[in-house]
UniProtKB/Swiss-Prot annotation:
Pfam families: HTH_9 (PF08221), POLR3C_WHD (PF22536), RNA_pol_Rpc82 (PF05645), RPC3_helical (PF20912). Signal peptide: none annotated. It comes from the Eukaryota. Belongs to the RNA polymerase beta chain family. GO terms for biological process: termination of RNA polymerase III transcription; transcription initiation at RNA polymerase III promoter; tRNA transcription by RNA polymerase III. The gene is RPC82. DNA-dependent RNA polymerase catalyzes the transcription of DNA into RNA using the four ribonucleoside triphosphates as substrates. Specific core component of RNA polymerase III which synthesizes small RNAs, such as 5S rRNA and tRNAs. This is DNA-directed RNA polymerase III subunit RPC3. Component of the RNA polymerase III (Pol III) complex consisting of 17 subunits. GO terms for molecular function: DNA-directed RNA polymerase activity; single-stranded DNA binding. It comes from Candida glabrata (strain ATCC 2001 / BCRC 20586 / JCM 3761 / NBRC 0622 / NRRL Y-65 / CBS 138) (Yeast). The keyword Signal does not apply. It is found in: Nucleus. Residues 593-614 are annotated as: Leucine-zipper. The keyword Nucleus applies.
């Protein structure tokens, strides 16, 4: 009996449920991925009218739903997209309920095969609950964002992880990650049985060990398929029911005690997948560390998002303190990336944030983890050890400004009278004693420099790096904080709000213009202002101010606050003030970016559908490489246009993703 079944049995008082074969595997015991071959199959017209995202109205109702369904459709096809759309719109459903909601247009077997593929790729979670008055169980399915994120970032994940290895290992690592992404999970034994590279097994096992130590691969457990809120509720009910009923404690104290115990057990269950001591062991035949061959491994999306956070902070530092300090800051982020805490406590996904005390406690705990966790602090010596050899930091600091005035020595040398012979030859001046002494000092110091050159260069490099770290720590934006003299850590809790604000301001400037940012900053600085105050501080025409405020209100960057002047709250005598609500503004911007990103995926799909025949012809084996000979000029022009539009869509998608992820994850 596993832990989850034990929890359910203790809560419900029922026997532990058996695993539903339709939840994970098909009838023959093998994982079914046949949904990927059904991309172009369509459902009935009534279902398509209900769930399709082809109309503008349906696409704008729920931006995240539009994005998730488009991502699923591009990878798994129309049927998988339809099922995910239902789960997002209606919440948890059983197979029978999905069958009824689709108006019986898909068979139950087809729905189960679709759910198997979605579950395998971590796009769906499930939970088994006992039926009332029966020993049978219902399996409820939920949509899971983690699988959608893995599909959306699949190319970037492969590129980011493989770039951390040497050139010889990059193709092998890229193949490992690609196989895990395409299958959802993979064990070491399964990969070694089908490996295409002719390398020793212990070297391949060493790559898996490195990926696990970096945090990119974690053990797949049953809790990865269990909804977080339901797991928390089961743990809480279990701890509450175990408290003695005849206790004299109040119900509030009992609930608090049960909550604290459930938190501890919840964290232990969530951290079990990242515990390397239970995943890596010594191989008795080679005495080398290896991953447990039967352990099922999957991609840790949170670890990858840490690297995306580091990239965003590096670009932000480059715009604030310059490229050299930003490069050293990038090394500091890379050094502490694996040990740094995640973006938020996983308990925030359980609904506990409805309590203000819980929110404050989580925020304080995150700030404490950023400073006190092992491996998150560093010094200049730590940075020097990982500085690339081809990266030069000498002469990267200017300690004092050069004066525009000429020195007295320069004036004297310029005013000295030069002697010439009859032929016009200039007689050089005689060397002074100072020149002789300087040359002698240089000659004497050459030997000492040869002996102590390495130590002096290291000392100078440490001093320069430490100066750059102090620049980052003393910046108005808190890129670093100093816990002890010359010991630093990265305060993510204070830094991420600054990053969000900077990117939001950049979007406002690029879309609505600089006057919009000026007025928004005026409102944000004064918190709650009237139009009269804005007219006096924004230094703009009154007509332009009203037009700009209207645009800001339209994009939810500024809100209107009604302040009544009378007791009866008469609208005719009320005053309307303006304010900025950052949480509302950021959420609106996130929805806007998500819709634009999904719309690009939708346009790409439409382009491929419109040119389906041409693309099939160009992708034939007998046509590849001979397009100019076998295709008509009009077909070549059309194919060129399709490639250019797809390339443009990919470029815009990556740019939108870099903006959207700041408001979605950070």
């Amino acid at each position: 009996m596993d832990i989850l079944s034990d929890i359910k049995a203790s809560v419900k008082g029922a026997p532990a449920p058996q695993q539903n074969p339709a939840a994970i595997k098909s009838e023959n015991g093998n994982v079914d991925v046949s949904v990927s071959n059904e991309i172009h199959q369509q459902t009935a017209a009534s279902t398509e009218e209900l769930m399709s995202v082809s109309s503008l109205e349906q696409r704008t109702l729920h931006a995240e739903k539009f994005l998730y369904t488009e991502v699923i459709k591009s990878y798994l096809g129309e049927r998988a997209s339809t099922v995910i759309s239902l789960l997002i719109s209606l919440g948890r459903l059983t197979v029978r309920e999905i069958y009824e909601k689709l108006n019986f247009t898909m068979s139950i077997d087809s729905i189960r095969r679709t759910l198997v593929s979605l579950t395998q790729l971590r796009c769906v979670r499930y939970l088994e609950e006992p039926k009332r008055g029966s020993a049978k169980y219902n399996t409820y399915y939920y949509y899971n964002k983690d699988g959608v994120y893995l599909l959306l970032y699949s190319g970037l994940i492969i590129n980011d992880i493989s770039s951390r290895f040497s050139e010889q290992k990059r193709p092998i690592v890229a193949e490992i990650i690609q196989n895990i992404l395409s299958l959802g999970s993979l064990s070491l034994n399964d990969y070694l049985e089908n490996v295409t590279y002719n390398i020793p097994k212990h070297e391949m096992s060493g790559l898996f060990v490195e990926l696990c130590e970096m945090g990119f691969l974690v053990r797949l457990t049953k809790f990865d398929y269990t909804p977080i809120k339901d797991l928390w509720n089961l743990l809480y009910e279990k701890e509450y029911n175990q408290l003695p009923r005849n206790s004299t404690q109040s119900d509030l104290k009992k609930r608090t005690e049960a909550k604290n115990k459930a938190k501890t057990e919840f964290h232990n269950l969530m951290e079990a997948s990242t515990d390397l001591s239970k995943l890596i062991k010594l191989d008795p035949s080679t005495s080398l560390r290896t991953v447990i061959p039967t352990a099922t491994l999957t991609i840790n999306i949170k670890r990858f998002l840490k690297s995306r956070r580091s990239l965003q902070l590096t670009n932000y530092a480059r715009s604030r303190v310059g490229p050299v300090s930003a490069q050293l800051y990038k090394l500091a982020l890379k050094l502490t990336e694996n040990k740094a805490p995640y973006f938020n406590d996983i308990l925030s996904e359980t609904g506990l944030l409805q309590d203000l005390d819980e929110l404050t406690a989580m925020s304080d705990e995150m700030e404490l983890l950023e400073e006190k966790s092992p491996g998150v602090t560093f010094t200049a010596n730590d940075i020097l050890k990982i500085v690339p050899k081809n990266y030069k930091i000498e002469n990267s600091l200017v300690y004092e400004k050069k004066s525009g005035k000429r020195s007295q020595n320069q004036e004297k040398s310029a005013n000295t009278k030069r002697l010439k012979t009859e032929d016009g030859f200039v007689i050089p001046s005689l060397p002074t004693d100072n020149n002789h002494s300087n040359e002698k000092e240089i000659d004497d110091a050459e030997v000492e420099d040869g002996i102590n050159e390495g130590d002096e260069m290291d000392a100078d490099s440490v001093s320069i790096i430490n100066s750059h770290l102090k620049i980052l720590a003393s910046s108005p934006v808190p890129f670093l904080k100093e816990t002890q003299p010359n010991v630093y850590y990265i305060p993510y809790s204070n830094l991420i709000p600054e990053l969000k604000s900077s990117i939001y301001d950049h979007i406002i400037v690029s879309t609505l213009g600089p006057p919009s940012l000026r007025i928004r900053r005026c409102i944000k600085e004064n918190k709650l202002v009237s139009e009269k105050v804005i007219n006096g501080t924004a230094l703009m025409k009154e007509k332009d101010i009203r037009t700009t405020i209207g645009s800001l209100i339209k994009y939810n960057a500024v809100e209107i606050q009604e302040v009544p002047r009378t007791v009866d709250r008469s609208a005719s005598r009320a005053v309307f003030l303006f304010r900025c609500n950052e949480s509302h503004s950021y959420n609106f911007m996130k929805q806007n970016l998500a819709w634009n990103l999904a719309n690009l995926l939708y346009k790409k799909e439409k382009i491929e559908d419109e040119n389906k025949t041409l693309l099939m012809k160009a992708n034939r084996d007998d046509v590849k490489g001979k397009e100019r000979e076998l295709l008509l000029p009009s077909e070549l022009n059309q194919l060129k246009m399709v490639n250019e539009r797809e390339l443009n869509i990919f470029t815009r998608s990556f740019r939108l993703m870099s903006l959207w992820e700041v408001f979605e994850f950070f």
